[in-house]
Amino acid sequence: MAKAKFERTKPHVNIGTIGHVDHGKTTTTAAITKVLADAYPELNEAFAFDAIDKAPEEKERGITINISHVEYQTEKRHYAHVDAPGHADYIKNMITGAAQMDGAILVVAATDGPMPQTREHVLLARQVGVPYILVALNKCDMVDDEEIIELVEMEVRELLAEQDYDEDAPIVHISALKALEGDEKWAGQILELMQACDDNIPDPVRETDKPFLMPIEDIFTITGRGTVVTGRVERGTLNVNDDVEIIGIKEKATQTTVTGIEMFRKLLDSAEAGDNCGLLLRGIKREDVERGQVVVKPGAYTPHTEFEGSVYVLSKDEGGRHTPFFDNYRPQFYFRTTDVTGVVKLPEGVEMVMPGDNVDMSVTLIQPVAMDEGLRFAIREGSRTVGAGRVTKIIK
């Protein structure tokens, strides 16, 4: 069957759900797709909760691990929606997920109010540069007391303000479950939530004019056709039959040609900044490429191993380290989609760095990473995020 072409008629916005485990992120995502499919059937299809929640581990522990992508349209926009993991163990995915958002819907259960992971996700959203957050106050059908709801709203606004988000952001009262069940009143609230997204999440400033760059998130082999790499285009545009380079992580760059571009199971002639897509690469084997590398316009970018960065070290309360670190500290530096070990050199006169400190540091990575000034990274020890920073200067 020939694949339908993806139409580029409306502004395209990447959005996602974040928040504490069991507050209803995935149910909210499912409710949005259902309500929009009912309201604009010619534009949308509904995704069932189970389809969004389809990570195998998910079934055993009731925690979202993999990132699910769904798409939907309002009258004004086309949205690609990631359902971001809600459990502290899966912050690694949260980082890759949150990095793909032009705005986020923070789901907070009115029955609980903000919880530790609510705070953690807002902090992470700030670190990885999610520009705007609005709030879906979920499970409102279960709270009769207006005062409780007002109290929760105040707490949420304080939390947003703490991380420099808009404390006057819309807080929409929803019941995702009731909306999924077809309750008209609550379906109306989901439409109000989407109206709030249309009105408040700014049209993303796309980086279309810069040379092409796409970090590799995943790699697949398609029998008889070759190797496909998937990811979100960070910059530039790409046409079918363009030559590209794959750089970073490995010693040598790999040259190849893009023989096909796919988005949401539809074929495209081109891809541009902001698109989540798959690139079919000529003559490339599965083992020639790995997550963490980037696909770029030939000659436009170079991988580096030494840089200076400005870093915020998470406090103990934020889930960071409990003890200071010293010169020659060797954590993992998380760039875009992967961890690379690096050795930290502290500035002269700085003997140690305490949790909660800001510090400028020089870093030498054990593998090269395609970077330029302003690129954000997280510092991690195993699965725990202990710092967040941005590259301030390339040394080598």
From Swiss-Prot:
It comes from the Bacteria. Transmembrane segments: none annotated. GO terms for cellular component: cytosol. Residues 19-26 are annotated as: G1. Residues 83-86 are annotated as: G3. Its EC number is 3.6.5.3. The keyword Cell division does not apply. Residues 10-205 form the tr-type G domain. Residues 175-177 are annotated as: G5. Keywords: Cytoplasm, Elongation factor, GTP-binding, Hydrolase, Magnesium, Metal-binding, Nucleotide-binding, Protein biosynthesis. Residues 62-66 are annotated as: G2. It is found in: Cytoplasm. It catalyses: GTP + H2O = GDP + phosphate + H(+). PROSITE patterns: G_TR_1 (PS00301), G_TR_2 (PS51722). GTP hydrolase that promotes the GTP-dependent binding of aminoacyl-tRNA to the A-site of ribosomes during protein biosynthesis. Belongs to the TRAFAC class translation factor GTPase superfamily. Classic translation factor GTPase family. EF-Tu/EF-1A subfamily. Monomer. This is Elongation factor Tu. It comes from Corynebacterium efficiens (strain DSM 44549 / YS-314 / AJ 12310 / JCM 11189 / NBRC 100395).
